[in-house]
UniProtKB/Swiss-Prot annotation:
Gene: Syt8
UniProt organism field: Rattus norvegicus
C2 domain span: 113-229, 241-370
Gene Ontology biological process terms in this record: acrosome reaction; calcium-dependent activation of synaptic vesicle fusion; regulation of calcium ion-dependent exocytosis; regulation of synaptic vesicle exocytosis; vesicle-mediated transport
Protein name: Synaptotagmin-8
Functional summary from the UniProt entry: Involved in the trafficking and exocytosis of secretory vesicles in non-neuronal tissues. Mediates Ca(2+)-regulation of exocytosis acrosomal reaction in sperm. May mediate Ca(2+)-regulation of exocytosis in insulin secreted cells.
Notes concerning its domains: The first C2 domain/C2A does not mediate Ca(2+)-dependent phospholipid binding.
Molecular function terms, GO-annotated: calcium ion sensor activity; calcium-dependent protein binding; clathrin binding; SNARE binding
Localization in the cell: Cell membrane; Cytoplasmic vesicle, Secretory vesicle, Acrosome
Length: 395
């Protein structure tokens, strides 16, 4: 019985003794056993594992980038050099590219509320001309940013002025433009140079930013002079007294159709009557095509809204000027020009910018307000050639 018991105990103990190594070897084979029990193909499992790994790495990278961005954003207000006009420079139109400038710090003290202007003056005694070099301006007074441009004139030359290009989104424009004015030596002591800084507005009145009035009699013009000048408060301009004209331009290169829409005028002299607008095309300094609007009576702000279409091939655009003139009857019965606007390749300032915008945005109407200029000034800039007489056949 003891033997039977021993045999039974041995028989019972053998399975226990053999089960221990089975459990020891089951650990390393656990993953292969699980893989074999899954009813999917192995390539699907490998793809799932790879996708999970890629997702995990992507989540880690996103967390790291978010932490770095927050840390950089916290440090940015402490660094003054990060202030810039990147978004404003991206809004530049056509060919106007504004150089990088770092002059947006507030003016020190209260003595410079209107900003400063760097100006160069040179007088040529041979040609009796004074050359005015507009270099740059800084710390202009405006809310946020502005689209400044400069307007230059001399008191002894009525109606003659020069306008620079418009510089977008900056308070420190770099002009780098030169203009000349005919001033005899005898008139230098009583001549005054006037430079106006204005903020360009396409559909409203241009906001003055500052003004410089420099008596030329107080300046030593024996040598080239270049220095900074303090801008003062702006005053009334001569063009504001003439009035303004709003019109749109549209050009289609494929058909050569130039559409001019005369919209309205404002600020005309109250003593004028029956105002209308003449539209004239000049080719190679000779009068080419023309048309005019209907007359508007009894108002200083006439509304026209009349369109005119001209056929102008692309090859003739560089030789063509567009002149819009406001005419009205004054004290005399005959109508006379009140003011004109010159557009085309020989224009300057806002009219040149309007012309460039029309060419840059073909098939799209571009509307804008323009200050009227003196008719004599525009005629002098055109330098029209006399018309050639028509040769009639002999009878």
């Amino acid at each position: 019985m003891q033997a039977d018991r021993s045999m039974k105990m041995g028989h019972v103990s053998n399975p226990l003794s053999t089960s221990a190594p089975v459990d020891a070897t089951a650990g390393p084979n656990l993953i292969p056993d699980l893989i074999t029990k899954i009813p999917w193909p192995r390539w699907i499992l490998f793809i799932a594992i790879l996708a999970a790994g890629v997702l995990l790495v992507s989540c880690l990278l996103c967390v790291i980038c978010y932490c770095c961005h927050r840390q950089r954003h916290r440090k940015q207000p402490k660094d003054k050099e990060t202030v810039g006009l990147g978004s404003a420079r991206n809004s530049t139109t056509t060919h106007l590219v504004q150089p990088d400038v770092e002059c947006l710090e507030p003016c020190s003290g209260g003595d410079q509320p209107w900003g400063q202007l760097l100006l160069s003056l040179e007088y040529d005694f041979g040609s009796q001309e004074i050359r005015v070099g507009l270099r740059q301006a800084k710390n202009l007074k405006a809310e946020g940013t502005a689209d400044p441009y400069a307007r230059v004139s001399v008191s002894t030359q009525a109606g003659r002025r020069h306008e620079t290009k418009v510089h977008r989104g900056t308070l420190c424009p770099m002009f780098e433009e030169t203009c000349c004015f005919l001033v005899p030596p005898a008139e230098l002591p009583k001549a005054t140079l006037k430079v106006q800084l204005l903020d360009f507005k396409r559909f409203s009145e241009h906001e003055p930013l500052g003004e410089l009035q420099l008596p030329l009699g107080t300046v030593d013009l024996q040598h080239v002079l270049e220095s900074w000048y303090q801008l003062g408060p702006p005053g009334s301009t001569e063009s504001e007294q003439m009035g303004e004209l709003c019109f749109s331009l549209r050009y289609v290169p494929s058909s050569g159709r130039l559409t001019v829409v005369i919209l309205e005028a404002r600020g005309l002299n109250p003593g004028l009557a029956e105002a209308y607008v003449k539209v004239q095309l000049i080719l190679n300094q000779r009068k080419w095509k023309k048309n005019k609007t209907s007359s508007k009576k009894g108002t200083t702000n006439p509304y026209f809204n009349e369109a005119f279409v001209f056929l102008v091939p692309v090859s003739q655009l560089q030789s063509m000027d567009l002149v819009l003139a406001v005419w009205a009857r004054g004290l005399q019965l005959l109508a006379e020009p009140v003011g004109k606007v010159l557009l085309g390749p020989r224009a300057s300032g806002q009219p040149l910018q309007h012309w460039a915008d029309m060419l840059a945005h073909a098939r799209r109407p571009i509307a804008q307000w323009h200050h009227l200029r003196s008719p004599r000034e525009v005629d002098r800039a055109l330098a029209l050639q006399p018309r050639l007489p028509l040769l009639r056949p002999r009878s």
